[in-house]
């Protein structure tokens, strides 16, 4: 019998890898890097209203101190001025979020509807789609994100429950502008 790796104590430096490090997840996130035009429809339960708006989302990979973690910056801003943000001040018209992958989780410095940090658990449907599950304060968020047509398009649907009542449903059709 041949020992492939006879060393029992491998040294990975200061930042050892997580056993469940998923290169597919890192690869999927790298496919999302770039500037996206996001055409959105929001269905809001409270107001019983539907809104359509266009946003820009920029996703950037950041340098990381750990070779085992992938860090990202997400920035968003509207294509033009919308009454939506005046009528619904809980939504941020523009903003920035830093997050990093650790295993099958996305650790966020803040969320879209909150400045609280938290974790999104990630499930991989196939090589093109991920599901993100997040909980913070009284919110439970379920987001499906699918890459299409050689990563030139993304389709996202987001369901948001507050205190176990469905409050927001969002559909986002996104077109990659800059890779």
Locate the predicted segments by residue:
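Calycin-type beta-barrel ligand-binding domains and close structural analogs
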Residues: 2-17, 80-179
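Amphipathic/hydrophobic helical signal segments and adjacent flexible N-terminal regions
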Residues: 1-94, 168, 176-179
């Amino acid at each position: 019998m041949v020992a492939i790796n006879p060393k029992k104590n491998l040294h990975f430096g200061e930042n050892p890898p997580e056993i469940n490090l998923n290169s597919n997840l890192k690869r999927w996130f790298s496919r999302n890097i770039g500037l996206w035009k996001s055409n959105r429809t929001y269905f809001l339960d409270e107001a019983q209203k539907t809104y359509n708006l266009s946003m820009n989302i920029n996703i950037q990979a950041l340098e990381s101190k750990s070779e085992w973690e992938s860090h990202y910056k997400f920035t968003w801003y509207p294509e033009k001025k919308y009454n939506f943000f005046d009528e619904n001040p809980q939504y941020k018209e523009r903003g920035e979020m830093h997050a990093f992958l650790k295993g099958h989780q996305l650790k966020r410095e803040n969320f879209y509807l909150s400045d609280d940090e938290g974790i999104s658990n990630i499930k991989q449907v196939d090589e093109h789609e991920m599901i993100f599950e997040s909980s913070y304060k009284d919110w439970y968020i379920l987001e499906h994100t699918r890459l299409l047509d050689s990563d030139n398009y993304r389709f996202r649907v987001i369901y948001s429950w507050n205190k176990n009542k469905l409050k927001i449903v969002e559909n986002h059709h996104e077109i990659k502008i800059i890779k």
